[in-house]
């Protein structure tokens, strides 16, 4: 008698796989029961399934009283795929993405979309960009080494490449001027400050420039930079705003400088956005003391890399989640909507290949003229 070894076993494996490998739809339905996302014996009923290249969208009729519940976050672990749950038009929508985000997307995989539009990152649905002419001020939060400085440098590189003659930077590089020192030689960088006194001086220059621009706008009866056809945009970048918090160890003089800085930064946040001044406020410590309410209320774009606690996440992006971000460069980008993004990675080498030609470029006449007015502190 001949035996075919394995034949019966193969049939059993296929049978068992069918039995135990439940479909996504079945797993979701079981999860509803197991976590008690039901009303008495009534549970959500699948109403429509829509498949696309990036995701499958399941839409459910739910019993009255059920909405998008944080309990449903477990679906991400149950399905081992990224899941977005929302509740709209009386229905529950569960979007299950086919794959997770990569841990690295190179900067050159993003397009150039316009003068003041910068790439923010890849989401599950594609790339996301930010328009600084729509939303002028941005807070960039994140604990140490999760990606703030790479992100700030990437923004600068993009803005310089797109507007070599129309963008200006004032940089407060408050961790000893280590992150942006080389940028001082760029023609677009008008001031770079590494301590309190230099920061106060740099911001006083910005304040003077704002006053002048305001006078000009009033004289032509224009309300904003676009209406007045002002081509230049001025970016004030703060890399570690936490350093500007006055504390007991500071000299009285330094306390005064930090107060002056805070005062001018508040002024920029409140009045200067629409006249062409954009503030990018970076901090490791998003606490109520460091994120002044005026600045928070006016910085309507937020980018948060990983933070230590959900409380910090609440301060930075008004919602928990930043404490759970998994890898370097991963962030929550929030304006009206919020997205999980993997921000573009750019190396120092690539940055200087792209913008190195604007370092100490004495060949252009316009360049020489601007550089005369350029103030380098320290
Ligand atoms: N978008 C990104 N994609 C992949 N890796 C990244 C990304 N951004 C940063 N990294 C990695 O994380 C490291 C630290 O990043 P970065 O210097 O920007 O941190 P940081 O938040 O500024 O830290 P600190 O607060 O200490 O200054 C980088 O050297 C790089 O290896
Ligand atoms: Mg840094």
Sequence positions of predicted segments:
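P-loop NTPase catalytic phosphate-binding loop
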Residues: 1-23, 57, 103, 107-219, ...
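N-terminal "pre-motor" subdomain/linker immediately upstream of P-loop NTPase catalytic cores
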Residues: 5-6, 10, 15-112, 116-121, ...
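Short, glycine/acidic-rich hinge or "gate" loops at secondary-structure transitions
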Residues: 218-227
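Short basic/glycine-enriched coil/helix segment immediately N-terminal to the Walker B
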Residues: 226-234
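Surface-exposed substrate-engagement region within the catalytic domains
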Residues: 312
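Extracellular glycan-recognition surfaces and repeat-rich motifs
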Residues: 341
């Amino acid at each position: 008698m001949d035996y075919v070894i394995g034949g019966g076993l193969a049939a059993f494996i296929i049978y068992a796989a069918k039995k135990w490998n439940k479909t996504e739809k079945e797993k979701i339905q079981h999860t509803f029961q197991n976590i008690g996302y039901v009303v008495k014996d009534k549970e959500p009923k699948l109403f429509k399934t829509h498949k696309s290249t990036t995701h499958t969208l399941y839409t459910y009729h739910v019993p009255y009283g059920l909405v998008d519940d944080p309990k449903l976050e477990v679906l991400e672990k149950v399905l081992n795929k990224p899941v977005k749950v929302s509740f709209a038009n009386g229905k529950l929508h569960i979007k299950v993405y086919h794959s997770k985000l990569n841990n690295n997307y190179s900067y050159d995989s993003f397009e150039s979309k316009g003068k003041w539009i910068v790439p923010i990152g890849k989401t599950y649905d594609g790339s996301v960009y930010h328009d600084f002419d729509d939303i002028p001020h941005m807070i960039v939060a994140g604990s140490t080494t999760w990606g703030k400085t790479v992100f700030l440098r990437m923004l600068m590189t993009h803005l310089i490449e797109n507007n070599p003659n129309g963008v200006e930077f004032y940089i407060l590089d408050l961790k000893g001027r280590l992150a942006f020192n080389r940028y001082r030689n760029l023609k677009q960088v008008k001031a770079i400050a590494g301590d309190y006194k230099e920061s106060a001086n740099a911001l006083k220059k910005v304040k003077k420039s704002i006053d002048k621009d305001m006078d000009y706008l009033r004289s032509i009866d224009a309300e904003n930079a676009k209406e007045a056809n002002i081509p230049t945009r001025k970016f004030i970048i703060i890399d570690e705003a936490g350093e500007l918090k006055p504390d007991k160890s500071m000299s009285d003089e330094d306390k005064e400088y930090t107060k002056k800085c805070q005062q001018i930064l508040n002024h920029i946040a409140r009045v200067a956005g629409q006249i062409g001044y954009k503030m990018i406020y970076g901090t490791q410590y998003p606490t109520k003391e460091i994120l002044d309410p005026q600045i928070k209320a006016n910085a309507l774009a937020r980018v948060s890399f990983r933070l230590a606690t959900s409380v910090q996440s609440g301060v930075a992006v008004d919602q928990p989640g930043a404490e759970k971000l998994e890898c370097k460069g991963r962030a929550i980008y929030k304006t009206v909507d919020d997205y999980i993004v993997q921000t573009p990675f750019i190396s120092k080498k690539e940055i200087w290949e792209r913008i190195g030609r604007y370092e100490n470029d004495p060949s252009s006449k316009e360049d020489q003229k601007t550089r005369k007015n350029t103030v380098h502190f320290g």
